[in-house]
Each structure stands twice: as C-alpha cells, then as structure tokens.
Design a protein with these regions (language model features):
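Multi-pass alpha-helical transmembrane bundles in non-GPCR membrane proteins
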Residues: 1-135
Length: 135
C-alpha cells in the first residue's frame, strides 16, 4: 500500500498538492472551536473532557486529511472519528442510560456488525457515492 498516494474523493479538490480542499479544511475549525467550548463548559465532568479532546483530534486529523489528501491522512481521519464514536457510545450508555460497564461494552461490540451490515446495504444506493461511510 502506498501511504503517500493522493486521494481524490471530493469535488472540491483543485489539485494534488497541499491545501487543495480549502473549504473542507476551513470547516475543520468547527471541531476545534466546539472542543474548546466543551472543554471550558464541562470543567468538572471527566467524560466531557475526554470527548472534547477527541473532538479536537478529529479536527486536527480531518484537517490533515483535507490538506494532504493522502492514504495516511485518510486513515488517521477515519480512526479519530471511529474512536470518538465508540467512546461516545460507551459513555452515553454509562452516563445517560446508567448501564454497567459490561453492558456498555457489549453494545459497543454489537455496534460493529450492525454498522457493517447497514453500510453494506447503503452501498446499493449509488446516489450516496463516497458519503456512505459517513452515514
């Protein structure tokens, strides 16, 4: 696998050089702004602090992806989002629903096949294009 191969998935891409998706790059600031706001508003809530760090990591990883648009950058973008989703799912089950650690982990594990099956089903809808991975 060529980790530095250019990726061209978005209509905004203007060239294969750095910062060739300026609008996508700019929208990543929203993640960083949300992370800072969340950090200061939830000073005593550890779960919110964890999620705010993860929001910032999504902003940074996505900015790298939309700046360089190479395989390595896409991987860290996807991984940062996946870690956030699983962490949020776990924390929501623990804090909102009051589930045990065991049950929260089981739900996280069950999320994998459900997500895989639903994503494969959505691949049949051609109009969704590369956006299927985000649904």
């Amino acid at each position: 696998m060529d980790w530095f191969a250019p990726i061209d998935m978005y209509c905004e891409r203007t060239h294969h050089g750095i910062i060739s998706e300026p609008i996508n790059l700019a929208t990543n600031m929203g993640f960083l702004i949300a992370a800072v706001i969340m950090w200061y508003r939830a000073q005593t809530i550890k779960a919110c602090r964890i999620l705010s760090i993860m929001l910032a990591s999504i902003g940074i990883a996505s900015a790298l992806h939309h700046s360089f648009a190479q395989t390595w950058a896409a991987l860290i973008d996807v991984l940062s989002i996946a870690v956030f989703v699983f962490t949020y799912l776990f924390l929501a089950n623990r804090n909102f629903l009051g589930l045990s650690v065991k049950h929260s982990i089981i739900i996280m594990i069950l999320f994998l096949p459900i997500n895989f099956i639903s994503s494969n089903y959505l691949l049949d809808f051609d109009f969704l294009g590369d956006s299927v991975g985000y649904i």
